[in-house]
Amino acid sequence: MQQEMEYIYEVYKEKNFTRAAEKLFITQPALSMAIQKVEERLGMPIFDRSTRPISLTDAGYAYLDYIESARHLDAEFEQQIQDIKELDKGRIVIGGSHYLNAYILPEVLAELLEKYPNVQIELKEASSAELAERLRKQELDVTFHCSPEFIQDFPRYPAFRDTVLLAVPVRMDPLADQSVALSSEQVMEGRHLQKDCPCVSLKEFSEIPFILLSKGNNLYERSVRMFDEAGFEPKTKMKLSQLVTAYHLAAAGIGATFVSDLLIRSPGRELNYYKIDSELVTRQFYALLPKRKYVSVAARRFISRFGDGSFHVGFHA
């Protein structure tokens, strides 16, 4: 059974019997005969040989789903046995955006590896959409997201929160003389998290240019909703995919942008920061797990580093 699944999966990947046979180190006639026996047992074809390249039939797609489920079960069983044999070891594949991998995870991973030095970490970086697809395919052990529409599809645990601030170049700041701006030092000290920190209306910045993230990014969706709340269409100077890049372009004076408070790690005088009067500025991120997948000891230890979900990198006040 295991061998026939391997044969069918290789033909599916290569979409060609000859190439698949070469990869499997058997002859093409032997491979064709083995698959024909499976098709005879099922009473229907797995591959449509009339197409070029060959393709799966409906029965073939059902069989492929079965193969992939079996492969995942095998991997989970091996992981469980590995956990039993080596409780102080393990491997975890983590998926994250550049923002998450560069600004959130280093501190967490350092703490994890200090306590469990034999744990192996594999860090994958991709867009949120790609990470979601990899999680659905069970290619990741864990990833992170904050959109309610997204997180409901997966088992999840509260991980950390951040606060969205508006970063405005000093030279174009319309409120620069009103003593409501926050400096980078104040943000680093957590001043914006205190209850008496003043909030301002986003409408105050309706006349200055904005740098926005591309559609599909959570911060893009939030910014659109905040502009709607404020009742104006932003003067968009530039759109891009990376939050960190937007932050540096704002610091260069090109336009205002929304940033996470966790990005601000060093003093600077190029930008003023504002806490916008909107409930959308607080983001709760969750650790998301694949459905129906055994959670390894290593993954559980990693998730436990975030505690109750109130983990806030860099702020100790």
Report the location of each language-model feature.
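A late-sequence structural motif
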Residues: 170, 264, 271-316
